[in-house]
Amino acid sequence: MGMSKAVPALPVRHIETAIAVYTRSFGFTAQYSDPTFAKLTRDDVEIHLWAADDDSWNSRPDTAPWPVCSGAETFLAGTASCRITVDEIAELYDELSRAGVLHPADAGHPVATDWGTTEFATVDGDGNLITFSTSTVRTQSPVVDGDGNAVTTS
């Protein structure tokens, strides 16, 4: 038995508003939607959106045993993230830059990482983080100590 793929499910406040952002800004196509759920695709990528639209937590007594009761509380919207692997990172970066969805701390270009990717981050209309990456060919893996600091090797 093997696993074949993972599908991120991101919490959003309003399904229809989020569908508009994902189709207009990210280039996804809505395959299915109802008031509480949507399935979107672009190329081989599938994303699910679920409605975090329960604001009853605002009127719950302070004695509630935990803040999440229904699992769809509005404060959950925008708290998720996912990573999507792409082939042409520069082209997608330019497209999403024009769409205005790059993360506020964007470096102005895709960034090469120490873990062998080149990537950039975006945020959807609710604040969910979507990072796009591509594998980077490395000639040598970095050596790090237990704190994650680069170690010089000879």
Describe these PLM feature segments.
Residues 1-19, 80-82, 133-154:
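N-terminal beta-strand motif that seeds the catalytic metal site of vicinal oxygen chelate
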Residues 13-16, 70-71, 75-126:
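Vicinal oxygen chelate
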Residues 16-26, 120, 129:
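Conserved active-site alpha-helix within GNAT-family acetyltransferase domains
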Residues 24-30, 100-104:
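Conserved acetyl-CoA-binding loop of GNAT-fold acetyltransferases
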Residues 31-76, 129-134:
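Conserved short beta-strand elements that form part of the metal-binding/catalytic scaffold
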Residues 43, 124-126, 147:
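Residue-level recognition of short loop/turn positions
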Residues 52-53, 113-114, 121, 131-139:
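Short beta->alpha transition motifs characteristic of CBS
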Residues 58-63, 94-95, 142-146:
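Short, charged, solvent-exposed linker or helix-capping segments at domain edges/interfaces
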